[in-house]
Every structure is written in structure tokens, then in C-alpha cells.
Amino acid sequence: MSLLTEVETYVLSIVPSGPLKAEIAQRLEDVFAGKNTDLEALMEWLKTRPILSPLTKGILGFVFTLTVPSERGLQRRRFVQNALNGNGDPNNMDKAVKLYRKIKREITFHGAKEIALSYSAGALASCMGLIYNRMGAVTTEVAFGLVCATCEQIADSQHRSHRQMVTTTNPLIRHENRMVLASTTAKAMEQMAGSSERAAEAMEVASQARQMVQAMRTIGTHPSSSAGLKDDLLENLQAYQKRMGVQMQRFK
């Protein structure tokens, strides 16, 4: 896996799924391929994106700044600086300085990532802030190692909370989760349908699922009543994909 592929993988792992994720993936690919060289416009676009947490925006802004060539005097962006200040916690800043002293002696991506993984996400963000604010200088490879370690820490905590939700025994949460997933799957079916001859069929299935979820939410139902809804819809989606010759490797 090339360095930039690895960076893209880690960064996208902390972006919530949805159309915005696809848009960000495209922007990252363009930046890494040298096709997007307008850092100012890129940062303005990033700043106004909805849904993303300030820290995710800060990390993306840091990656764009590292990758897109720009004039030396280009102003640093406040939204990135605020996101990478370790929540203003002096403890994070102390650790960030210690981490910076260690990684500036490193020259490889993996070496820097290995060292960085033993620090908290707050300390890692502060360390990125030092580099972003030009208070410290490291090679691009080392900076990318820092980025990937931060994303790994964030993705780990997201995974833990996701696993807690998936394995929860609370029937109300499980019921709501199944309905949300059914709605999302319906949306995916509508997006995939496009203008193919089977589009009407896909739209019909998706529309029925949406109506079912809406009815369940409106009148209130027993928590176990949604159990088959998501599975039926996923089955329909997978059967539809096969007929269309589309194969998603993993769809949950």
C-alpha cells in the first residue's frame, strides 16, 4: 500500500458514511494526484461542510496544507488552529511537545506512527497544531505518520461505541437502529437505481421500506417488530445488485 493510499484510508475511516464522505474521498484523491492546487478554495470548502466534527475538519485541513503546494505567506486557518489545540488542555500541550521532540528525530512514516500511537488523541492533535502553526518542522512522511496515528485512535473509540450499540441488549435501541439501517439501505437502493430498466423495481422496494419505517415510528410498535425489516431489505438490495451485475464486497 502506498503512503498516500494509507493516509487516505486512515483519514476516511473517521468521516461518517454518506454523500459527503464520497465527496471528501474525491477531494483527497485529486489533491494526492496533484489535480487540485488551490489550497485557499479547498480550505473554504472544508470549513463550510456540515456534519464533520471540528477535529475531523482540523485533520483534513492539516492534510490538505501538507499536500497542496502554496505560497509561503499563506494565512493559517483559524478553524484548523482551534481544532488542533488539544481542547486547550495544558496537559495535552506538554505531551505534544514531548512527542514532537521524539518524532522530529524520525524520518519514516511508520517510525513516527509507532511512536505517536502511545499518546492520546488530544496530545496528537496538539502536536499537529504545533506543526501546522509552524512552531515545529518535520518531514511530510513523519507528519502523515502523526495523522494516521490520530485517526487510528479516533477510529478505535468510534468502533468501541459502535460495538456497544450493536451488542446492546436494550430492545428500544436495537429496534431504532434496525429502522435507521433500513432507511439508509432504502436510500442506497434509490441511489443505485439510476436510470436502469430495473430502476422502477428498486424504487418500489425502497419506497415500501420507507413507508414501513415511517408507519412504525408514527404509531409506535413492539421493539421486535422491526427485526425482519432490515434483513428483508438487505436481501432485496443484494438480489438487485446481482441482477445489475454490481457486487458490493461488504454491505451491512
Curated annotation (Swiss-Prot):
Any GO molecular function: RNA binding
Residue numbers spanned by region RNP-binding: 165-252
Keywords from the named record: Host nucleus, Membrane, RNA-binding, Viral matrix protein, Virion
Motif Nuclear localization signal mapped to chain: 101-105
Cellular location(s): Virion membrane; Host nucleus
Family matches, as InterPro entries: Flu_matrix_M1, Flu_matrix_M1_C, Flu_matrix_M1_N, Flu_matrix_M1_N_sub1, Flu_matrix_M1_N_sub2, INFV_M1
Membrane-binding: annotated segments: 1-164
Recorded GO CC terms: host cell nucleus; membrane; virion membrane
UniProt membrane topology term: Peripheral membrane protein
Gene3D superfamilies: 1.10.10.180, 1.20.91.10
Pfam families linked: Flu_M1, Flu_M1_C
GO BP terms, alphabetized: viral budding from plasma membrane
Oligomer status and interactors: Homodimer and homomultimer. Interacts with NEP. Binds ribonucleocapsid by both interacting with genomic RNA and NP protein. May interact with HA and NA. Cannot bind NP without genomic RNA.
Additional information: Most abundant protein in virion. When expressed alone can form virus-like particles in transfected cells.
Protein name: Matrix protein 1
Species of the source: Influenza A virus (strain A/USA:Phila/1935 H1N1)
